Design a protein with these regions (language model features):
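PLP-dependent amino-acid enzyme catalytic core
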Residues: 1-169
Length: 169
């Protein structure tokens, strides 16, 4: 799948490029050139676990850049904690997103990003440096997600005296 800048749809890039670049040079945001209809892609979605669903969705965006085995590795590494679906009412279920290592829903995204970027920097002779500025749980999720990822250094900036006690922990 190709991605374009929200400020210019004319230049298409692949997923790896968009991921590693972060932002287009025209200060837009990268968007997929098409949005797959995952309801049609995943028959019986209500009977699948989160890793199976994640694989199908990730594959629809990553298959041009990664082998299926690499996508499976990314998903298995990124979602290595419980994420139970809890029945609330008849026909109403909720996916609990707070069971990750930092208890934040951002664990899913940060770990997926770190494992995907790790695949991109393998066999690269340069380190990737990532600068993150946050006042909340993004920092802990990113720090945990990128911990011990070879070839990637993460610097997290927090505003002085603007972070809650629970988020510091």
């Amino acid at each position: 799948m190709k991605f374009y800048s929200t400020n210019s749809k004319s230049k298409l890039v692949d997923f790896r490029y968009a991921l590693m670049k972060g932002l287009p040079s025209d200060n837009g945001l990268y968007m997929p050139s098409e949005i797959p209809n995952h309801a049609k892609l995943i028959p019986g979605i209500n009977k699948l676990d989160i890793k199976d669903i994640s694989f199908v969705i990730a594959k629809s965006f990553l298959s041009e850049d990664f082998k299926n085995s690499e996508i499976e590795d990314i998903i298995d590494s990124a979602i290595s904690f419980d994420s139970p679906v809890v029945k609330i009412f008849e026909n109403i279920n909720i996916l609990e997103l707070f069971h990750g290592p930092t208890l934040a829903f951002k664990d899913f995204g940060a770990r997926f990003m770190s494992k995907t970027m790790e695949k991109c920097v393998i066999n690269n002779d340069k380190n990737l440096n990532i600068l993150v500025a946050t006042s909340g749980d993004t920092g802990s999720a990113v720090a945990n997600g990128f911990y011990n990822i070879d070839g990637i250094n993460v610097i997290i900036l927090y505003p002085s005296k603007k972070v809650s006690y629970i988020q510091e922990k």
